[in-house]
Amino acid sequence: MKRIVYISVLLALVALNGAAQNISGSWSGVLEVEDTRLPFVYNITAEGRCTIDSPSEKVRNIPGDVDYLSPDSLCISTSIGFVYAGRLQDGVIHGTFTQNKVSVPMDLSPVHRPQTPQPPFPYHTELVKFTNANAGATLAGTLSVPEGAKCVLLMVTGSGLENRDEELFGHKPFAVIADCLARQGIATLRYDDRAYGESVGGDVMGATTSDFADDAAAGIEWLRRSGRFQQVGILGHSEGGAIAFMLGAQGLVDFIVSLAGPAVQGDSILLEQCRIATPELAENLTIEVLHRDPRIQQNPWYSFFMNYNPQTDIAATACPVMAVNGESDCQVPAEMNLSALRRVLPANGRHLIKSYPGLNHLFQHCETGLPDEYDVIEETFSEEVINDIINWIKTLNH
């Protein structure tokens, strides 16, 4: 649930005007003005796309327009009025950040993400597309298939538009998980959200979790129609976990892996987020006050989220479930959600419900668990959790 309190980034990537070459990748820097330090992360792809993240502002995927790009230089502007221009030298982009005709030096260094998988891969990958005809959406994704794979998972991202790797701040958790699973004989299909990345069509501004669940259902149907796998499961992170139970309640999947998926009504989660993020401001905040907020009332996604109670779908889910949370998760708090899930999930000897000390919402080892740590942590996803996912799925085949 990477929508931080009251912030929704529903902006599409903007194509770059040239080849990224040596500058492709994620670059981080800190803008220092008087006593203020504002980190930025520039994500530049080899295919010619760019997004900008502002971790301390809890905003990501700001689209960047590239006015100039060469193998060692760039100039990126935004519709919200700031421009960055720099030149690559000795592995660092030296440049200036300009806004309102005021320029400040800011250097960008490459972001180190050691878990991101690199080719060649010992398994087959296919670029595929499937369609949610009712929504007019064509979803583009990557199918990773190791030799002899009998089991496949559809991977569903959290809230906000994201690519198939669930990429943020240079981290690519879904790519990391998919690679590890493929190396252990488990296939995956991960896809760009509707109207994002290589996916096209489908309403975005009016879409709710239920609409994104329809996209996921189309992916499950595509996998079943392929006839290549004996078991079709779903892995969902955050909002994707809620979607997993929506499909589980309909009997569409053979098993569920829920990573920090919500198990209580959205208004309770949002209230707890507020209390954790700004305890002094949330002292007198109530669920009733949140429901009266016009920003929530006028936003279809938030309105649905606030009123949706996943326990109805959880209670109707009969398939095996692995549900996990980091105990330092500040966005979908572990105790609140896992205890609720234990109460309502129908008994099944193959369930695994587990919390992990010291892990945040992204399943990184952390200090505070707050979102402003996500970008400064090198680890993308806990290997312990990945190994537990692999071992649990393997038990389902015995």
Task: Enumerate the language-model features and the residues they cover.
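Alpha/beta-hydrolase active-site loop
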Residues: 173, 205-226
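Short beta-strand/loop motif that positions the catalytic acidic residue
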Residues: 317, 323-325
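Primarily recognizes the serine-hydrolase "nucleophile elbow" in alpha/beta-hydrolase
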Residues: 218-274
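N-terminal cap/lid segment of alpha/beta-hydrolase-fold proteins
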Residues: 111-148
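Short amphipathic alpha-helix adjacent to the substrate-entry channel of hydrolases
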Residues: 167-189
